[in-house]
């Protein structure tokens, strides 16, 4: 398959890239600071540019995979309206735009795989923006799946990565971590499988 991978230079994106490429897929990487295409999906015009340039390089895409989406982590009292808006733009609207524009750009039975996270169902202190964004992404996936068939859309919702415990483990006390390889396998399930409207929780 020809796959557009957003957020390819981060820890998760690199793991997803390695796994999908190892299975014989042709990957076009997108990142803000690296990759085949250097673009920011929080800007709808740059999403359009990503699709245009990907089509020039590879023709019709079979799948779009997102491993990107930043949200701020602060207590509610320390958050500003712009903090919440930035988190929503960065993780929700950017990924929605990938699907909204992408339905006319990918194969008729192609797929989208978005990124969400554990905080939508198991919130942590300072994580209200992430919980908001993740919940919105998951609700969008379930609803959009009804509209875009036979194209498919799913999300992957991991907990904290084993490889990131040193940096983030204190924010997730008692939460079982998940290896990046397991998360990448959930992306494979979405890309190569037949389900739609699902949120895969790697374990």
Regions found by a protein language model. Name each.
Residues 86-90, 94-97, 109-137, 141-149, ...:
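Catalytic loop of short-chain dehydrogenase/reductase
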């Amino acid at each position: 398959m020809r796959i557009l991978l957003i957020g390819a230079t981060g820890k998760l994106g690199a793991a997803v890239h390695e796994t999908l490429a190892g299975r014989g897929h042709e990957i076009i990487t997108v990142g803000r600071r690296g990759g085949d295409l250097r673009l920011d999906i929080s800007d709808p015009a740059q999403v359009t540019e990503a699709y245009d340039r990907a089509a020039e390089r590879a023709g019709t895409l079979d799948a779009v995979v997102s491993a990107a989406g930043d949200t701020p982590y602060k207590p509610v009292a320390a958050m500003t309206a712009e903090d919440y808006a930035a988190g929503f733009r960065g993780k929700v609207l950017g990924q929605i735009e990938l699907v909204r524009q992408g339905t006319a750009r990918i194969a008729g039975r192609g797929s989208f795989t978005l990124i969400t996270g554990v905080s939508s169902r198991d919130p942590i202190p300072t994580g209200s923006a992430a919980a908001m964004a993740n919940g919105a992404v998951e609700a969008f996936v379930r609803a959009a799946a009804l509209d875009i068939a036979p194209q498919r859309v799913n999300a992957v919702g991991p907990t904290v990565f084993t490889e990131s415990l040193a940096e983030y483990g204190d924010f997730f006390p008692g939460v079982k971590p998940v290896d990046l390889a397991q998360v990448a396998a959930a992306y494979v399930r979405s890309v190569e499988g037949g389900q739609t409207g699902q949120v895969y929780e790697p374990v």
